From Swiss-Prot:
Residues spanning the membrane: none
Name of the protein in its database record: UDP-glycosyltransferase 88F5
Binding, UDP-alpha-D-glucose: 288, 357-358, 375-383, 397-400
Keywords: Glycosyltransferase, Transferase
GO molecular function: UDP-glucosyltransferase activity
InterPro entries named among the record's database cross-references: UDP-glycosyltransf_plant (IPR050481), UDP_glucos_trans (IPR002213), UDP_glycos_trans_CS (IPR035595)
Organism: Malus domestica
Pfam families noted in UniProt: UDPGT
Top-level enzyme category: transferase
UniProt superkingdom: Eukaryota
Record SUPFAM superfamilies: UDP-Glycosyltransferase/glycogen phosphorylase
């Protein structure tokens, strides 16, 4: 079987897709004669498995040197009233025996050159070491968020209170221009009494103990101060920082994305975009889990209507529990019922609203698209950067508030919306109108667009023969061969 690189994805289709993209990059660069890729993934109650089998069949067919190993089903044992993050982290730990068995079996017929894990799969780090396999992390957000995570054990020492109670208190991270509010920390660390808090501290403390960290970004995109803070050891003041390899941007090809959305509606929105003037359309899409209460949808609609701008807006079904934005949108809802009366009719000449899903990568590359309202999920950020489209930053969950800070203040490729933290991040219609006009009409918006266009060219160059990301991938492979 030769040399193999084993990747271990955290639960869920999004994490598997990220690992597949890394595997594809390695195979594309070095060919299947050099490395084959095996991706380990979990099966159980916390995993959304509906879209996974079809996706894996597609990848296995188109990339035969990438194979998949699904673990036996694990039933989560936790019944206590704890957070979803804590339940997921416990679920991953329960898969440790399967990780050990998989590495044991693979090692019998192949030389495992590297074991690459997701941050949430940190409990597998000592297993890789146990087999004397060089073990790396694949970090799927940007360098600024990585700097924060590396530094987080030091932040933990600065207070004994929960960040959710500190709210407006700000914390400084090495290399960042602006501090982060306590309430904008990643959700699993907001409550010090949640088991997920100690899990996250453990994950962050183990990052430096790996053989290296592979990051889905490219050097030219990142603030030099952040890159210097990581390389100079400021983020891990108590010990050595492992090598960091910036190998992105890794973006999934649209043809391999899920085609669950209505094909006719998808074609309609692309045809509509082709008829609009250059850089005139604002695209609004908040990721696979970005669902808003009806009251917020009405404010967005009012802001868009008042702005007078052309728009393509992806609307997901409002969540049943309004406090939760992490609910998958589906098509079984009345679009007119969640928007202001007459909105669709009044804006029909300059706007289009689609339910649940649009082919984001294709949309962002359309000549008519001039701006993107995003939840700041890192994949979406990279897709916008590659397409050269400036952003309005509207973070919802995960590390997105961290990304917002850096996109607006350090990278200067986005305008931030003002969110009312005391109202769950609510944004008024007036604020929507203000930021939309700022991006689409002002000199500042034009400057952002120019900057994004240049970064798009740099993204392409980074993956070229002499680019920074190619050099970093060569350095990674040199470290394992």
């Amino acid at each position: 079987m030769g040399d193999v690189i084993v990747l271990y994805a955290a639960p869920g289709i999004g994490h598997i897709v990220s690992m597949v993209e890394l595997g594809k990059l390695i195979v594309h660069r070095y060919g299947p004669h050099k490395f084959s890729i095996t991706i380990l993934y979990t099966c159980g109650s916390v995993v959304d498995i509906t879209s996974i089998p079809a996706y894996i069949r597609r990848i296995s067919h188109s990339h035969p040197s990438i194979s998949f190993l699904q673990f036996p089903r694990v039933t989560n044992k936790i019944t206590r009233n704890i957070s979803g993050a804590a339940i997921m982290f416990d679920f991953i730990r329960q898969n440790d025996p399967h990780v050990r068995r998989a590495l044991q079996e693979i090692s019998k017929s192949a030389a495992v050159r590297a074991f690459i894990i997701d941050l949430f799969c940190t409990s597998a780090l000592p297993i890789g070491k146990e087999f004397n396999i060089p073990t790396y992390y694949f970090y799927t957000s940007g360098a600024a968020a990585l700097a924060a995570f590396l530094y987080f054990p030091k932040i933990d020492e600065q207070t004994t209170e929960s960040f959710k109670d500190l709210r407006e208190t700000v914390f400084e991270f090495p290399g960042w221009k602006s501090p982060l509010k306590a309430i904008h920390m990643v959700e699993p660390v907001l409550d010090r009494n949640d088991p997920a808090y100690s899990d996250m501290i453990y994950f962050c403390s183990q990052l430096p103990k790996s053989n290296g960290i592979i990051v889905n970004t490219f050097e030219e995109l990142e603030p030099p101060s952040v890159l210097q803070a990581i390389a100079g050891g400021l983020c891990v003041p108590d010990g050595p920082t492992p090598p960091v390899y910036y190998v992105g941007p890794l973006i999934e090809e649209e043809k391999e994305l899920s085609k669950d959305a209505d094909a006719a509606e998808k074609e309609d929105c692309l045809s509509w975009l082709d008829k609009q003037p250059s850089r005139s359309v604002l695209f609004l899409c908040f990721g696979s889990m970005g669902s808003f209460p009806a009251a917020q949808l009405k404010e967005i609609a009012n802001g868009l209507e008042a702005s007078g701008q052309r728009f393509l807006w992806v609307v997901k079904k409002p969540p049943v529990e309004e406090k939760s934005k992490q609910v998958h949108g589906v098509d079984d809802f009345d679009l007119k019922g969640v928007l202001p009366e007459g909105f669709l009719e009044r804006t029909a000449d300059r706007g289009m609203v689609v339910k649940s899903w649009a082919p984001q990568v294709v949309v962002l590359k359309k000549e008519s698209v001039g701006g993107f309202v995003t939840h700041c999920g890192w994949n979406s950020v990279l897709e916008a950067v590659v397409a050269g489209v400036p952003m309005i930053a509207w973070p919802l969950y995960a590390e997105q508030h961290m990304n917002r800070n850096v996109l607006v203040t350090d990278m200067e490729i986005a305008i931030g919306v003002e969110q009312r933290d005391e109202e769950g991040g609510f944004v008024s219609g007036e604020e929507v109108e203000r930021r939309v006009r700022e991006l689409m009409e002002s000199e500042g918006g034009r400057a952002l667009r120019e900057r994004c266009k240049k970064l798009g060219e740099m993204a392409s160059a980074a993956l070229g023969e002499t680019g920074s990301s190619t050099r970093n991938m060569v350095n990674f492979v040199s470290s394992i061969t």
